[in-house]
Amino acid sequence: MSAVSESVLSLSRYYLPVYRPCQVVLVRGQGSRVWDEQGRDYLDLAAGIAVCCLGHCDPDLVAALVEQAGRLWHTSNVFYSEPSLRLAQELVDVSRFAERVFLCSSGTEANEAAIKLVRKWAAAQGRLPEHRTIVTFHGSFHGRTLAAVTATAQPKYQEGYEPLPGGFRYVDFNHIEALEAAMVGGDVAAVMLEPIQGEGGVMPVVSGYLAQVRALCDRYGALLVLDEIQCGMGRTGTLFAYWQEEVVPDIVTLAKGLGGGFPIGAMLAGPKVAEVMQFGAHGTTFGGNPMAAAVARVALRKLASVEIAANVQRQSVALRAGLEEISEAFGGVFTQVRGRGLMLGAVLAPLYAGQASAILEVAVEHGVLLLQAGPDVLRFVPALNVSDEELADGLVRLRAALGDYVSRFGG
């Protein structure tokens, strides 16, 4: 490690130690490549946790940011700004269901807004507080704030934050009978789920499941809330993942790829709930920030293009095939590659169970950046415009990394 790296990393003692970053200082990015301060390049198949959907420093996004930065940075929602109004209109137009949009700065905020909207809607329906339950799913991830982490049905994220807010109920993912059993009492106001669980192991809904959930929501008078913070914005091959299931949600939450790397979140509200929240019912200082909205407008236009959809489909096939070939080359290091589009998870074989984090460290040594989705799954969420050459290079580096790991630790 260079003196520059050591100097920069020494500053980490001033940061609340809630993260455990890789010991690399990244200073520049272009497309699907990033460079550290020593000039070494890395092929980025993580995209800032599915955020940089158009790669690093996309010229159109940079131009939008620079132009808006020279005009107006921030107004708050005490005043209108054109970029946020235009973005809201464009999100409504492309969503195929929404009538209104709430803009915020992160996925957690979008989910908090959705949770509050559900509760407000139930109250407006005359439902007692005990009849405003929100059902979520084991393995889910909806954010880190107190309500969102309670909606996240994973104890490891909740430990030590008790007492948690009430009014949530957990059921098994992809288990329609369990969901109906949780709803039959008539106290459920909403069902909230990810079409593909990200942190839960890159686990997609089974075919037809969302339609069954929609039917149960209609039967028992509940809203359907879809968290597309990670799987939305073109990542699965369609702009919204729910399009592939042909269901109509009541609420959809977005973030990550919506800003192409600039912080922004959004909650989209359908006709049943669009007028529930009126003046003073909710708010945010930074939501709808002109710079974030200006960038998101360009990102949305590009992510909704047929070119991006076609590239996602083509590169998904190539990535899946490459992972399966690598697995076979090393005696079946993966038992399964699952997911949709460019949101794929490679499930580690029993011999390597629990070793995802260690594999990621070796991958960095070989110049490829990955993620994990739990201890047993390697997660791949590259830029949606990743090129043939970039993806091929990433697979070459991954093959070398796994070969190194297997030889060192696989026995």
Swiss-Prot record:
Pathway: Amino-acid biosynthesis; L-arginine biosynthesis; N(2)-acetyl-L-ornithine from L-glutamate: step 4/4
Compartmental location: Cytoplasm
GO aspect biological process, one term: L-arginine biosynthetic process
Source organism superkingdom: Bacteria
Obligatory cofactor(s): pyridoxal 5'-phosphate
Keyword Amino-acid biosynthesis (UniProt): yes
TM region(s), chain numbering: none
UniProt-recorded Gene Ontology molecular function terms: identical protein binding; N2-acetyl-L-ornithine:2-oxoglutarate 5-aminotransferase activity; pyridoxal phosphate binding
EC number: 2.6.1.11
Major location category of this protein: cytoplasm
Broad class of enzyme this protein falls into: transferase
Catalytic activity: N(2)-acetyl-L-ornithine + 2-oxoglutarate = N-acetyl-L-glutamate 5-semialdehyde + L-glutamate
NCBIfam families (alphabetical): argD, PRK01278.1, PRK04612.1
Subunit structure as annotated in this protein's UniProt entry: Homodimer.
Any further remark recorded for this protein: May also have succinyldiaminopimelate aminotransferase activity, thus carrying out the corresponding step in lysine biosynthesis.
Listed name of the protein: Acetylornithine aminotransferase
Biological source species: Xylella fastidiosa (strain 9a5c)
Lineage of the species this protein comes from: Bacteria, Pseudomonadati, Pseudomonadota, Gammaproteobacteria, Lysobacterales
Gene: argD
